[in-house]
């Protein structure tokens, strides 16, 4: 095969031509769709005589005209990826292109395709080129009109971006709709939907008094499940006005629900398209986690209206400019509507579970990558979640009001433009009249920094010193690293468990006084931006225990000299609840790693009684938030522990985590039982923090108890399963029962399927639960489920649930006999023929094959080599597989 072409950030050039306006006409048909595109073109630079090169994939060109005249065949060239007009006229001109496409055959789900009988689009990042020939790049912004013609019976609803300005009937049972979007946008934000849909309608009055019509479109049978999404949308609109002063700018906002969708959701201007699971919810069919995800993602896509649509990215390398910022915004939104600490813990856990391994593997890239083969592969946890942490650091440095000033200046300067990460950095620094030395390294250096800290107390001078050093590990293409700018939020805790007032700090030859409007300061942010640096706190009357990196103020690994007793002390006393949780996590990680070493040396495993007591006191502490308690008694995941080992050992980590879980369940059994009993409720389901926290704590305790596999605890879980009145509690009980192989597990799984087989979203949960299971030899069960009548390889959600879920069970995916690897290798090649984007997400599970022992390495490598040598492999899969092999 021809090796795919790599694209580099440093090679960016402005477009030779600009598009001022784009008029699209779609004649939607069952066999083919005709697309007519009329574009007003102007030169990007005065007097340019360059050829005009347009992107295009899988298109049949029917005609091309310039200024109303057909072009002769010698005046343009077409190949499999481009249409080039050799000698465009000087100055402005009109370009008209007619193409024929086949949406019903488009299984890639990018461009225009059909999903359950409806037409639908997905254009980000480079899907618009599958609709018509175009400069398909984000720095080409134009105003759009879109006229859609279709059969009125089959497609009664016709939607596109902006405002509906005309509609009517046509001959032959057809009808049309004409949409106009007055705001300039890049092609990736174009959207079209046509089909049989019903809508939930509501309205929102903006802060300036504009009444906006809100509609959520879905097949009629699902309409009742859109109430929570509508609540989430209105809450997001209000929050963005209150927190960022950002008001919606059109009279209509549509959301459309689609069962077959590659992404979670898409922020197309005024016509958001969502995968079903991120909109549809009822207490009986969706869990608290689903409700929270819907709130966050509906918020996220709405927030893009300003951070992404009004101000967009100059090129795709800048993706974190819109995504890191908008993830940060949706995290803040969910925090304000729920419990901030619990949300922070969830976000940091996600970062450590998924992003840290990516940053330490062959696909490591900065939040702004330097190159890519296929942009779809860079919609990653690094660009999104680490990107959000980088945005959060601006807020940590400048405070909420300074961050708001930076945002205001960013919009004032760049509304209607396609810009870069440097533009955002400049707006933040200029608005606060401050420079952040070497902060831009976060955009260009890959890898997770490790910060080491040692402390010392001098009683005679009453000073406390913190010495920091930092190291960023080598990553592919970046062997040598520069020091990063790392904001470290610090508090000092006295022997009674209270925060000490901080008066002044000496560092780098400067004495800095700490006051805040005459009020004492208990947490300060240290600006650590050298290889090594010391900070000395003055007027510290006794030796404190430092609380470091409060609120997780930077996305780093922290290696401190805190003793075990310091950590137990912080677990009991730290006023920063995130660090209270973190102290427990550090203790858990240390315990698990030492037990893994014991297991590998075939020593008897024993649990530290202090650890059990520490968790018991958290469990009994009625002053703590219940969801916080649930998080605090949950052990770190297997992946997080494997990540800390020189050679990852999935069997040892699984055995140790299972041992600790059962031992805790045994020793805390009475406390766990009373917690389950005390947190039952017969009230109707409500989505609010207190109710969710109660369910989270109850379900966490139930999972511990069921792990014992004793008749009384199994019966308890079965009773909870049978008596549950909502999906959160029913599914948690099912998951608790599913930990142990046997008849009860099989019967309950079958009962659940029989009850919910007609709800495809619940069936996806059922697939995921079985796929992620750690029961021995699970690969055979998953193989069998591939042939289940409810499974469909063409539906991304089902693939993510079953195949993605299986890759999430380290002990089965990394089975010693290579059966997990073989299963994935075969599935990836099947999937690649249907949907390359989804296939490349699956093949990513192989990327860290070198972390394992030699026999596993050989087995995984064989699958990667088999994949790379396959005929007709997509660029998407080739990029991930070849980079994984090269590592």
From Swiss-Prot:
Annotated cofactor note: Binds 1 zinc ion per subunit.
Gene Ontology biological-process entries: proteolysis
Keyword rRNA-binding applies: no
CDD domains: M1_APN (cd09600)
Ligand binding (substrate): 124, 264-268
GO molecular function (one): alanyl aminopeptidase activity
SUPFAM superfamilies named among the record's database cross-references: Leukotriene A4 hydrolase N-terminal domain, Metalloproteases ('zincins'), catalytic domain
Binding positions for Zn(2+) per the UniProt entry: 300, 304, 323
Gene3D superfamilies: 2.60.40.1840, 3.30.2010.30, Neutral Protease Domain 2, Peptidase M1, alanyl aminopeptidase, C-terminal domain, tricorn interacting facor f3 domain
Active site per database record: 301 (proton acceptor)
Site (Transition state stabilizer): 384
EC number of this enzyme: 3.4.11.14
Pfam families: DUF3458, DUF3458_C, Peptidase_M1, Peptidase_M1_N
Catalyzed reactions per annotation: Release of an N-terminal amino acid, preferentially alanine, from a wide range of peptides, amides and arylamides
Keyword Transit peptide applies: no
Record keywords: Aminopeptidase, Hydrolase, Metal-binding, Metalloprotease, Protease, Zinc
Cofactor: Zn(2+)
NCBIfam families (alphabetical): pepN_proteo (TIGR02414)
Family: Belongs to the peptidase M1 family.
Matching PANTHER family: PUROMYCIN-SENSITIVE AMINOPEPTIDASE
Protein name: Puromycin-sensitive aminopeptidase
